[in-house]
Amino acid sequence: MNKTGFERGEVNGIRVHVMPTTRFKTFAVSLYMGTPLAEDTVTPTALIPFILRRGTAKYPETTQFREALENMYGAGFGFDVYKKGDYQMVQFRMDTINDSFVSADESLLKQSISFLGDAVTNPVLENNAFREKYVTAERENVRKRLESVVNDKIRYAAERCIQEMCKDEPYRLNALGQLSDLDGLNGANVYERYQQWLENSTMDLYVVGDTTLEEVLELVGSQFARKTNTQHAYKISIPRSAGAEVKRIVEKMEISQGKLNMGLRTPITYGDNRYASAWVANGILGGFPHSKLFTNVREKESLAYYVGSRFDPYKGITTIQSGIEIQNFDKALNIIQEQLANLQAGEISESEISQTKAMIRNDLLESRDSAYQMIGYDFNGRFADKDRPVEQLLSEVESVTPEQIQSAASVLTLDTIYFLTTEQKEA
């Protein structure tokens, strides 16, 4: 029973995706819950999974919660909070050993889905609100994470560039929320937001392991208590065009190394037929150590401590990040723009294309060895409403032509230049 694709169903408004396979010694369970990014909900929503991991109605104390995982032969439980396009995503993960390797009284897959369902839908409450001591502790945890961004100047500059570029868009928001909102959060108002979140989230539950779709549907139906059967779908916003004039932002801090970041707009997203071409184009521009930015800005000209580019296909944005000597701003900016212009003019070597395709191919092939990576690639398709199995992505990338790469690069338009510096410097 080794299938390469996911079988799909739906129960309680939850989309269920199962890959029956005996390849792995564990069950990989992943639950995605997405809601639109919004200023008034982003902070309480970010706090929710931190509170949920503290205890359930069945295991109200955190020590009991952790002991329950240990009793499932050391099952793992974790979560991430991040943004995907204009959505705030909360992803829960559980992994537990395959039943055939142990002699448990009850199916470990059933125990895992029951535990996850409990954690998400049946939290510990006091006076019809989240337990205040958990809210207080986790609020400080989130505060420290948000405050740590300013100490990591690479992350800080990347976030500030996006904030300036997307000033009136939800995408400007940090997925962990806003520091200014934390003090106003308590057990009552976060629980109120939790109830809305549980009812209105788009939910996708994945299982990879030695099971069947029918078994998982039955387990999810009985273990996930939800007041609604409505299945919400993601709505991907149409990418914006760059402004008529490039935004130029200079910010000063006590730093020794300048951070030059650039934001570009593209109409190409994951659902576009040109997606593979844009992926390869970004790889050639700045996605890998052999890219134009790395070899020319860093190695040949020695102008950057680091330099690279990142393509977000769920938003239609490409960002360029670099760390430079402050006095080299003009020269670095010119050479970065020169590399982009060369790519857009079709000045692309066979070596750049073949190396980039090889790097992407290796990443895709390696994903087949990880249940969670296979889940991640499949969810990309669910999110964008464009099914692209790994085999199809491999084929699409392999068949990209130099002309298609140039065409995908040519629609990149510079929107924002952000420079973090210590000097009075006009960008």
What are the functions of these language-model segments?
Residues M1-Y73, A104, Q178, Y191-N296, ...:
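His/Glu-rich zincin catalytic helix
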Residues H17-M19, K25-A38, T43-P44, T62-D118, ...:
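M16 family metallopeptidases and their MPP-like homologs
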Residues G55-K58, S100-S103, N122-R131:
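Short, polar/flexible loop-turn hinges at active-site or ligand-entry regions and domain interfaces
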Residues R66, N122-L146, Y234-A242, E338, ...:
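Acidic/histidine-enriched alpha-helical segments
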Residues Y82-K83, Y191-L198, S309-F311, Q406-S410:
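Short, flexible, solvent-exposed loop/turn segments with mixed acidic/basic and small polar residues
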Residues V142, S148-V150, C161, M165:
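Glycine-rich, mobile lid/loop segments that gate access to catalytic sites or pores
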Residues K144-S148, E245-S256, R361-Y372:
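Short, low-order "capping/linker" segments at domain edges
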Residues G184-Y191:
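Active-site glycine-rich loop that binds ribose-phosphate moieties when present
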